[in-house]
From Swiss-Prot:
Membrane-protein topology: Multi-pass membrane protein
Location of the protein in the cell: Cell membrane
Domain of life of the native organism: Bacteria
A GO CC term attached to the entry: plasma membrane
Pfam families on file: DUF2512
Lineage, opening ranks: Bacteria, Bacillati, Bacillota, Bacilli, Bacillales
Transmembrane segments: 11-31, 34-54, 60-80, 89-109
Keywords: Cell membrane, Membrane, Transmembrane, Transmembrane helix
Protein name: Uncharacterized protein YcbP
Primary location group: membrane
GN (gene name): ycbP
Amino acid sequence: MTHVKALAIKGIMTIIVLYLVLGLGFGFTFGDTLLMTIVLGVISYLLGDLYVLPKWNNMIATLADFGLAFLVIWLMGMPLSMGMTGGEVALAALFGAIVMAIGEYCFHFYMMSKEIGKKHYLETRTDS
């Protein structure tokens, strides 16, 4: 249940951030933004929140989330954007990734306070 709650919080944060930046700022549709939210949310939760954050620290996990957000938004944004140049999509991805990184930095405090991901990390570390 803790993962469901964490994913819900992350999903709400991500859809709000991406719609404000990409939808209102760059003209992406809500459907495109929702699709990016789902893909980015699942990948960043598994890699950033459950693997990188428990293993290293908040700053490293935030930097990883920034890079991941930029890549996902840029790569998904290229075919989804109508009439935007590659540079415009990259700019949208940069702004989206910056705001997502700020949100992820705060979200990581929630993850650490609930020790979500820590148990999995400790189990895999003691198994080897």
